[in-house]
Every structure is written in C-alpha cells, then in structure tokens.
C-alpha cells in the first residue's frame, strides 16, 4: 500500500498529486516486472524447484525493494504478486507475504551500496559446496571471468542467532564474510549449511550471477573428481580474465554508443 492505496491496482488519479502518483505507480510496475522476470530466469535455467529460491530488486532512489512472495509457485506468479517493502521491512505495497528471506536481502542492500538485485537459490552444486562449508576454488578462467577470487563461505550461525532473527543474522553473517572482501568483485557467497546468495547491479544481473555460480560450482566438482590435486588458477591469469571484463580498462565486449 502507498498512502493507503493499492498502487498496482489503481486506475484513477485525482487532485494535485496525480503526476507523483502516476510516476510512483509506473516505478513500482517496472520494478515488479523486472523482479518477476529475474525470478522466472531461475526457473528457465533449472536453478529452482517448486517454490525454492527468490530474487529481489531495489530502486535506490526511492529506497524500495521488490521481492518474490513466500511460497507461491513460479508458474502462478504475476507482477501483482511481487511484494514491495522499504529497507526497514515495512510492506509498502502488495497483498501477499514477502519471501521469508526478505531480511537477508535487506541486510545486503544496506551494506553493499552498489547492488540493485539479490538472488537466492538452492541450486544443486553451489548448495553442495555450502553444505560442505568449503569455498569454491578458481580452477579456470570461466570462474575468473566473474569472480575475482574463490567464492567464500560464511561462518556457521550460533544457536542464539538461529533462535533469534534468523534471516537477519544470515545477512549479517554474509556481511561479516565480506568485511575484507569486495562484494563487487565477488558477487556471491555460500551460506554455511544453507545455500548460495548472489547479487548484482539489478535483479537480472543477480539472477545471471546465480546461473554462472552454479556452472562454476559444477565445473569445480568435476575438476576435483578428475584430479583431486588440481591447483587453483595462477593469480596473474585469474586477475587478467576478471579485469579485462570488469576492470577500469576493460576491453571485453563492445563499446557502448553515446
């Protein structure tokens, strides 16, 4: 709700607030559609089963977060189902309960100032690494193209953290893991005993990184199955591949037109 009005369903405008109301309505409409599409990308790529997982997106200008509702099958989702909250977790618009992981997403948005999307899955291979409480090593340039280092794993949550505000504490554990790491250079983490979270500049970018994470997690498993003594990629080659794509002087891809 916004000012007591369901802005997604609203079709009439009145008074001097017409323009603001319309612009806000369009902002939420666009954000919801982007978040829905990112959630459906997880389905298309085989990263989620049933109602597993969730993707959110944030509008930094309005400090609003849109996220998949809790327990709703992907096949049933429409933009109107996407729930919008502020950074305090107060529902701004939407009739359904938000994902139970909302508090984790909000912690990441609060602490990682450059991100605009968060994706959480229980994809098979990335989750296996999380359950093994083992960082995903970089064995090759595919990993290096997206993550400038091993994908880290959080510490285990304490009994008190689990019994308390569990989802918020999960987010806090992720943020502690990145106290000395750059979340822009390694846009993913494995939550110990749980599953991965990924992020990016948008909901679509977060979902994209979740797809790539699962791919490199699977390749790392296969690499170790072939050779248990496989060595991580040389630091020089690792940095070369990451920086040619994401660095200040990146030259991968096409020059954007002005």
Label every PLM stretch briefly.
Residues 18-25:
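Hydrophobic alpha-helical signal peptides and transmembrane signal-/tail-anchor segments
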Residues 26-258:
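Glycine-rich flexible loops
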Residues 7-9:
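Short hydrophobic alpha-helical segments enriched in small aliphatic residues
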Residues 13:
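Cationic, low-complexity basic patches in intrinsically disordered or flexible, solvent-exposed regions
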